[in-house]
């Protein structure tokens, strides 16, 4: 559904697609950056909702305390609010990354499948499976799992380092 909506908005014969093509020489569909854009559109709500929850649960007395000490709103945001909400932002980012890594539908609709140009791991797995290359598909699934594991390990190590004060 999201991929179809993106095609309706940014297709080569649609007003936005034509505008970008005529004014900037940029084709917004069937290329590698349309795959990235589709993944972001699909994954962003997960990141936003999780980060928003972190900001909504922020203890405002911390900000008020900093204000009484004469700190600016910018200082309070970066030195008080962001550190307190860091875990929620990080959790949302990891959720969005995981969702984007496995994104197939919108990506295949707006970017297509051109090996070496617009193929993502998810679209490659599908194409290999469709052509009965289960070993090839499994290799890419393992690559996907390894990437996910490395990202989660890095996030966990970063969190441990932050908690230890390093």
How would you name each of these model-derived features?
Residues 29-33, 37-40, 44, 62, ...:
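Alpha-helical membrane-protein architecture signal
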Residues 61, 65-67, 137:
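Short hydrophobic faces within alpha-helices
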């Amino acid at each position: 559904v999201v991929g179809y909506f993106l095609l309706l908005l940014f297709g080569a014969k649609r007003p936005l697609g034509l505008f970008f093509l005529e004014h900037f020489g940029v084709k917004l569909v069937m290329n590698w950056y349309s795959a990235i854009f589709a993944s972001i559109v699909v994954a962003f709500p997960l990141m936003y909702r999780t980060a928003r929850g972190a900001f909504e649960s922020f203890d405002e007395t911390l900000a008020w305390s900093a204000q009484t000490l004469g700190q600016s709103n910018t200082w309070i945001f970066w030195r008080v609010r962001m550190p307190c909400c860091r875990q929620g932002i990080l959790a949302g980012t990891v959720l969005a990354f995981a969702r984007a890594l496995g994104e197939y539908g919108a990506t295949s609709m707006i970017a297509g499948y051109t090996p070496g140009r617009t193929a993502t791991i998810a679209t490659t797995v599908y194409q290999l499976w469709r052509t009965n290359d289960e070993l090839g598909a499994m290799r890419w699934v393992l690559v996907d799992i390894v990437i996910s594991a490395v990202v989660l390990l890095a996030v966990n190590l970063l969190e441990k380092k932050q908690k230890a004060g390093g």
